[in-house]
Every structure is written in structure tokens, then in C-alpha cells.
Amino acid sequence: MKVTLPEFERAGVMVVGDVMLDRYWYGPTSRISPEAPVPVVKVNTIEERPGGAANVAMNIASLGANARLVGLTGIDDAARALSKSLADVNVKCDFVSVPTHPTITKLRVLSRNQQLIRLDFEEGFEGVDPQPLHERINQALSSIGALVLSDYAKGALASVQQMIQLARKAGVPVLIDPKGTDFERYRGATLLTPNLSEFEAVVGKCKTEEEIVERGMKLIADYELSALLVTRSEQGMSLLQPGKEPLHMPTQAQEVYDVTGAGDTVIGVLAATLAAGNSLEEACFFANAAAGVVVGKLGTSTVSPIELENAVRGRADTGFGVMTEEELKLAVAAARKRGEKVVMTNGVFDILHAGHVSYLANARKLGDRLIVAVNSDASTKRLKGDSRPVNPLEQRMIVLGALEAVDWVVSFEEDTPQRLIAGILPDLLVKGGDYKPEEIAGSKEVWANGGEVLVLNFEDGCSTTNIIKKIQQDKKG
């Protein structure tokens, strides 16, 4: 499956929030201090990186999108270092300088890839006049496709509700990385992106995925949100939207060195993808891939388009087109965005023969993409008897995915794929045999969506049952 990155260069995003400077001191440690039972680090490298809302803007700019950053800083060396670092990566800064406060700075001391201590230099910006921030937002709304509010509870978003209303009035989606348990502050936002700990701090401990969905949907209703994305660490992400099935995406992280700034990467990629004109589901797909990359780096980091493309391609190509239901929905959404016609068929495909191959090739000719939905082993056993399937599901799917005619392969557990088809809603639903169109599972849903249903003939003389009988006869003979 070929995956096309969003057109990030046409995306304009404004980030407003708590800006900070992350400082890193690196060095070896080989002894314990005689003054106290602590390691002595001989510092040999010092780095400075934008953090907080500034890291979100960096992530947006690293994708090639147009990033604008608004926040509160002091008038000091840290503010100047921030401005220079951000200008170097094409982030347009429009800071509000507050003479009475220092720029928020976090110093981390590391040795042997381990963080030993963090020192914070800050005074909250609560009580600072928010009007200059509002003015900057108003000036930018006509030229951006998304507004990110990055909340680290340092005071820049004290008037967050007014900021939400300004953006919603202009029709600009508002994405918020929340802080604390008072989600009333974020009422009316387009999307909240809490991690699981932040989510459970508001709704209570969730023992199952079903509880996450149930309580998340209540949260959406209570605070008039358009959507909620719960990031769940090694369990991936869950996107919840009113009137839609939950979208659960498994994690793509191979190795985890440091989760610092991972939430910034997620919301940055989400915003840039939405501002480029892609759907929220597609935005989550790319954000999930980006998160898998960034947690494999040390410290606050960004993801380049090449890294993102490689991560996405690696996931999309796994198993020769074999996909989860959630991944398939994203792939179909992307295909539709490109104007491609999606064809779908289903079956057991136990022992693949010439009749199957011919049928699938003919089905593929009717559109641009072909989905093959395959009965699980349990489903096959219920339909065909205890002796079937001959080949387990994984092998059947890999063989189907290797066919040139087949783009995507997905499995289903039920006796029929009606639920799956209703979730995918292909442009054309195809079935082989002597069915009448109205007898085909999922036909009513496809027709109701404006799609077509077609019956194709199988090649005469080819059937899995006949092949099995012949094998059994040959063994007896």
C-alpha cells in the first residue's frame, strides 16, 4: 500500500501556550561525591532546545508546515536563546515580553543516557494581562488552518475559554493538550489530547477499553467537545467521536528511550495534518506513527517528513497488505481523498485456486483498490464444519495479500462481514457465486450509502471442496 504524506507545506498552524527553554547538561560519571551520596557528573556538553509550546511549534515546522508561536517570556538570555533557536528552524515567534518574570527554564543533567536530576527556574504567569495574546490570535485566524493551545499550567492559557471562542467563531479547529483535572476550562474545543493518566484523573480508573470509550464519550458530551484522543503509551491511541465507532490504534514504538515531549509531537502532527486538509482519522494515523519515532530519541525531539514517511510505510506494508480494521479505515479514507474507487469482497479462501485468482483479478478491474475480508478460523469452522479451515487465518491472509490484484486484507470474526462492510462502506461490494444482490451481507448498507452491489461468476470447475475431495480420494487410492 502506498501512503502519501499530507501537503504540509500548505498548512498554517498557530501555537499559543506555555513557552519554555529546555537545557541539557551531559557528561560521564564515575564516582560519588564526598559531600553527599550523589554521583558527580563531569559536564562536557551543553544543549538548549525549545520546550513546552515551543516544542509543539518546532514539531510543526519540522514537517515543513508554517508554524507561528505565541507565548509569554521574560526579557532575558533564555528568551533570546529561544527566539534564535526557533528562527533557525523557521518558526515565526511573536512573544509577549513580561519584564517582571523570567523565561521558564528547565535544566536536566544526564549521564549514560539517564536523567539524574531536573532543576526548574520559573514563576507562573498567572495574573498577566491576556489581551496581547488575544490580539495576536485574532490577527492570525484568517491565515491558519488550526490553533493549538499547549497548556502546561504556567499561566499563558489563563484565558483559554476566550481563546477557544475566538477560534470557533472564525471556524478554525482548536486542539488542546490539557493540564490538570478542570476540563471545564476547555469546553467547546475541537479536540482534547490527554494521556491516559490525565484522562483517568478526570474520569476515574479504567480497567477495560470499553470503560475508556464509555467515559470518554460522556466527557465529550459534558464539555461539548468535537472529539477526544486518549494517548495510552504502549497501548497506542484511542480516538472517540460522537456518532462514530471508536478508533483504536496500536503503538508503533520499537524502542522507548525518553517520552519527554512526545505529547507535543502528537498534537503538532495532528494540527499540521488537519491544517493540510486531511481528516481527523488520517491525522491520528500520522500522529501515532510520529509518536513511535520520537520516543526512540533522547530529550525533546521532532520528526522529519522522511522519518514520518518511513514509519508510515513500514506500518502500512507489514504483512503484504494485511491490516487491522482500524488501519483499513484510515487507508480507505486516504484512498477516497485521492478520488479512488474502493471495491470490497469477502470469503474463506481456504485453499487458493485458479478460480479465486481469476475472480479477484476481475473484481480488482472494477475499481482502484480491492479489499478482501476473510473469515476467521472460528467463523470458518462454524460455516464449513470442524475439518475446516485447512489453512489457518494468518496463512490465508498472507497468500491473499501477495496477489497483485489485492490491496488490503482484513479478517472478521462473525459469520458474515455485515458489520465490517457497514463500517467501511465500499463504493462497490462484490460477491462470487449465484447470489442475488439483495442476499449479499452488507448490501443494504452499501446501497443506502449510494454504492453498488454486483455478483460475479466463479470459474467453472474450481472449488475448494472439490480439491479437498480429490486429495482425500488420492490418499485412499
UniProtKB/Swiss-Prot annotation:
GO molecular function (one): heptose-1-phosphate adenylyltransferase activity
Annotated pathway: Nucleotide-sugar biosynthesis; ADP-L-glycero-beta-D-manno-heptose biosynthesis; ADP-L-glycero-beta-D-manno-heptose from D-glycero-beta-D-manno-heptose 7-phosphate: step 1/4; Nucleotide-sugar biosynthesis; ADP-L-glycero-beta-D-manno-heptose biosynthesis; ADP-L-glycero-beta-D-manno-heptose from D-glycero-beta-D-manno-heptose 7-phosphate: step 3/4
Documented EC number(s): 2.7.1.167, 2.7.7.70
Keyword Chaperone: no
Any single Gene Ontology cellular-component annotation: cytosol
SUPFAM superfamilies referenced in this protein's UniProt entry, alphabetically: Nucleotidylyl transferase, Ribokinase-like
A Gene Ontology biological process term: ADP-L-glycero-beta-D-manno-heptose biosynthetic process
PROSITE patterns: PFKB_KINASES_1
Chain positions recorded as ATP binding sites: 195-198
Catalytic function, reaction form: D-glycero-beta-D-manno-heptose 7-phosphate + ATP = D-glycero-beta-D-manno-heptose 1,7-bisphosphate + ADP + H(+); D-glycero-beta-D-manno-heptose 1-phosphate + ATP + H(+) = ADP-D-glycero-beta-D-manno-heptose + diphosphate
Function: Catalyzes the ADP transfer from ATP to D-glycero-beta-D-manno-heptose 1-phosphate, yielding ADP-D-glycero-beta-D-manno-heptose.
UniProt subunit comment: Homodimer.
Protein name: Bifunctional protein HldE
Organism: Escherichia fergusonii (strain ATCC 35469 / DSM 13698 / CCUG 18766 / IAM 14443 / JCM 21226 / LMG 7866 / NBRC 102419 / NCTC 12128 / CDC 0568-73)
Gene that this polypeptide is encoded by: hldE
